[in-house]
Regions:
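N-terminal lobe/hinge region of extracytoplasmic solute-binding protein
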Residues: 58-111, 142, 205-207
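N-terminal secretory signal peptides
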Residues: 1-21, 42
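Surface-exposed binding/hinge segments that line
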Residues: 119, 152-195
């Protein structure tokens, strides 16, 4: 609750929220009316964010193969980078997940939620001096709808039938009604680029608070404040530097010694040590992120569902949460949705570690010999240790898992979504529809388990157009059961996003949407020194 109040207070300080809105949202969150009024008065008098300074981020996840094309954002580094230099049409509220305006300042659906009209913000400039127009928006969305783009948003864009300009408005027509449609446009790949990025998707030119000055994939990137940025509540520092630090020990040392202001992916095992550092603050956020072991359902031996079930029952989830997450997370149930999502399908039995059931399904599968699991320290914090733990728990069921540690550099292009059994992570998505459309729809480019089921696709489309919430929830329940019992994902844990910063860093927003303040860490914080 304190994080939410701090966030609302910052909105008041920056003139983004009036008294009525502030009190309404704090009362809705369970704060008494009298207390909300006092909080508003205090917030209005609070210190404004400080401007200036050079912000340094030490980030894990960078690779020599990183791309500046937002459609190909694969790593933590490119995720933050595109938020530095670019904007989306729609964002999600960091605490509720509801859609909030960005480059689209308002929207209106048709009665059947099939056609949506978005008013595009005027007076916005790209870093190259060009004014933002609705044509840039149309071109961007069409590029990400093209199979050749290899965009991570392609699964989401397949629900769109037509995209066109109407004066200063964007008109989007869907294949079927979807009440969640605005949140589809908050997919982090859909950064608006001049002419949609068709001229050069790697240009790194957008409308964001920082202009990209240099880019060395897998090494570093630098940005300078864009003086004509259209928002007043973002972009407080003068410049930003991302330094790729894939080694967890090096990141921790860099933060402790003051070489950087912020690091991501703090290993839970080192949190206690970092807490003892006098100038360090731990930033832990619960959300929709999850760590996974992914099997390709169309590749032997994982095309046998009994083998997949054996490997699911061979996972000791409680031990994973305790030893890998250090308690910074919760047990998963082999489908990618948790209770932070609207219409969460309750009542699904929690899958537990069961060596006997694992042995039963393993024998039934007819598989003989070891199973090769590829992993790397960049897959998620503690991924290599998690693979070894999994190897040990599976051994008790008579299953031999061979663990192969792969190099971090190139993991996201050479192993993930390529090899048939590997470790990975997902940051979650704003809605169930978007999560399933991105990673489980048969035609999605990022269907990393090769779960291709026409009956599942049909349920997804039915749920998308179903406006009755009770019926929609039933459909999501059926989809979750199908993924859980027949899919290729082993999801042992939903992770908290554990990062750390210098105490000089102020204004950090804990965002349920995704890691590192949903990618906006550099644009939301300021330096108090």
């Amino acid at each position: 609750m304190s994080d939410y109040k701090n966030y609302l207070a910052n909105q008041v300080m920056m003139g983004k929220m009036n008294r009525r809105e502030f009190i309404g949202r704090t009362v809705a969150a369970g704060v008494a009316l009298s207390s909300a009024s006092t909080l508003f008065a205090t917030s209005a008098e609070a210190q404004e964010p400080k401007k200036g300074g050079h912000l340094k981020l030490g980030l894990e996840g960078g690779s020599a193969t990183d791309s500046k094309d937002p459609g190909k954002n694969l790593s933590q580094v490119t995720f933050v980078s595109s938020h530095n230099w670019g904007d989306l049409l729609v964002e999600s509220d960091p605490f509720t997940g509801a859609p909030v305006p960005s480059l689209a300042e308002s929207w209106e659906p048709s009665k059947d939620a099939v056609t949506w009209t978005f008013k595009i913000r005027s007076g916005v400039k790209f870093h190259n001096g060009k004014d933002l127009t609705v044509d840039d928006v149309v071109a961007t969305l069409k590029r990400h709808s093209d199979e050749k783009s290899e965009s991570g948003a392609l699964g989401v864009m397949k629900s769109i039938k037509d995209i066109k300009a109407d004066g200063g408005n964007l008109v989007v027509t869907l294949n079927e009604g979807n009440a969640d449609m605005p949140l589809l446009l908050s997919a982090y790949h859909l950064v608006i680029q001049p002419n949609g990025g068709l001229d050069d998707p790697e240009a790194g030119i957008g409308t964001g608070p920082y202009k990209m000055m240099s880019w060395e994939p897998g090494v570093r990137a630098t940005y300078e404040k864009f003086p004509e940025y259209w928002r007043t509540d973002r972009g407080f520092v003068d410049s930003v530097e991302i330094i790729v630090m894939n080694d967890a020990t090096a990141r921790m040392a860099a933060l402790s010694s003051g070489q950087v202001h912020f690091i991501n992916r703090v290993d839970p095992k080192t949190v206690g040590m970092l807490k003892r550092a006098p100038n360090v603050e731990i930033l832990s956020t619960s959300g929709r992120g999850h760590y996974v072991f992914i099997m390709h359902c169309n590749t032997a031996p994982f095309d046998n569902n009994d083998l997949r079930l054996a490997l699911k029952y061979a996972m000791d989830r409680e031990t994973m949460v305790k030893k890998i997450l250090g308690g910074y997370g919760k047990v998963g149930n082999d489908f990618p949705i948790n209770s932070t999502y609207a219409l969460f399908p309750e009542g699904i039995e929690q899958r537990s570690y069961d060596p006997d059931k694992a042995a039963f399904h393993y024998k039934k599968s007819g598989h003989d010999g070891s199973v090769l699991l590829r992993t790397s320290e960049v897959a998620f914090p503690g991924a290599v240790d998690a693979a070894v733990l999994y190897q040990e728990s599976a051994k008790k069921a008579g299953i031999n898992i061979e663990v192969k540690r792969e190099p971090g550099d190139g993991y996201w292009t050479n192993v993930w979504n390529v090899q048939p059994f590997s470790t990975s992570y997902w940051g979650g998505r704003p809605t169930q529809d978007q999560m399933y459309s991105t990673a489980y729809l048969s035609t999605a480019d990022w269907n990393d388990t090769r779960f291709k089921r026409p009956d599942f696709d049909k349920l997804l489309l039915q749920a998308r157009s179903e406006l009755d919430e009770a019926k929609r929830k039933e459909l999501y329940h059926a989809m979750a059961m199908m993924v859980r019992d027949e899919g290729g994902v082993i999801l042992p844990m939903f992770n908290d996003f554990v990062n750390a910063s210098s105490k000089k860093v102020k204004g950090y927003v804990h965002d349920i949407g995704n890691d590192m303040s949903n990618g906006y860490v550099a644009t939301r914080v300021w330096l108090d020194a």
